[in-house]
Amino acid sequence: MEYNTSQLCDIYQDQVDVVEPMFSTFGGRSSFGGLVTTIKCFEANGIIRQIVKESGVGRVLLIDGGGSLRRALIDADIAAIAADNGWEGIICYGSVREVDALADLEIGIQALASIPVGADEDDTGDSELPVNFGGVTFLPEDHIYADTTGVILSPEPLDIE
């Protein structure tokens, strides 16, 4: 499904939070949206690898990586697992790597930057908790919508018809 965050903001301006502009698009899908699943981890992606093995149909993985630009939390392998399991997209407050491979995958991916250094593979981190960055608090079960213009958050699903 295609999402236009500008139109959604025009229609639902009093109902959405707008995330501060900071993300670049890396995945093969330029717009995506769904129910938020949160992860908080720092320079380690084992917990991410575990979560993307779950069914992601209708879900967006939102990762608070502490804004780290030193190690990539998302690589082609993790993103491919997520795409294979139906995840709509990944928003990473952190870095990605293997950018050319990410662009070939049928999943939306937004992150702060790319770097060739991979993250540690330990399972350090937590999931399904409130996280805060970009001037917004993200709660599990919120609904998030992203495109090349920006990222918006709503406590309820938005009617895009």
Curated annotation (Swiss-Prot):
CDD domains (alphabetical): RraA_family
Lineage, top-rank taxon, reads: Bacteria
Listed under GO biological process in this entry are: regulation of RNA metabolic process
Keyword annotations: Cytoplasm
> What GO annotations for molecular function exist for this entry?
endoribonuclease inhibitor activity; enzyme binding
Give compartment(s): Cytoplasm
Taking the first listed entry, what is the main subcellular location of this protein, grouped into a coarse class? cytoplasm
Kindly state one GO CC term assigned in the UniProt record: cytoplasm
What family does the entry list? Answer: Belongs to the RraA family.
The function of this protein is: Globally modulates RNA abundance by binding to RNase E (Rne) and regulating its endonucleolytic activity. Can modulate Rne action in a substrate-dependent manner by altering the composition of the degradosome. Modulates RNA-binding and helicase activities of the degradosome.
Q: How does it assemble?
A: Homotrimer. Binds to both RNA-binding sites in the C-terminal region of Rne and to RhlB.
**Protein name (database record):** Regulator of ribonuclease activity A
Which organism is the protein's source? Tolumonas auensis (strain DSM 9187 / NBRC 110442 / TA 4)
